[in-house]
């Protein structure tokens, strides 16, 4: 019975760590995308765009 409880606790801990890691990665991606959106110069209406 204790072994089953330990396994369930470890599974719950791994799920919590995984979700917090995904949230952290998503927030980092949002910060980076916001930073690069600000840094890009606005496109000008050019005839020949490469």
UniProtKB/Swiss-Prot annotation:
It is found in: Secreted. The keyword Methyltransferase does not apply. GO terms for molecular function: toxin activity. Keywords: Secreted, Signal, Toxin. It comes from the Eukaryota. The keyword Membrane does not apply. Its main location: secreted. Residues 1-19 form the signal peptide. GO terms for cellular component: extracellular region. Expressed by the venom gland. Belongs to the neurotoxin 10 (Hwtx-1) family. 67 (Jztx-67) subfamily. This is U37-theraphotoxin-Cg1b.
């Amino acid at each position: 019975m204790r072994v089953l409880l330990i396994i369930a606790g470890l599974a719950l801990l791994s799920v919590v760590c995984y979700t917090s890691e995904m949230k952290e990665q998503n927030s980092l991606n949002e910060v980076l995308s916001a930073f690069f959106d600000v840094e890009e110069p606005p496109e000008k209406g050019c005839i020949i765009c490469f």
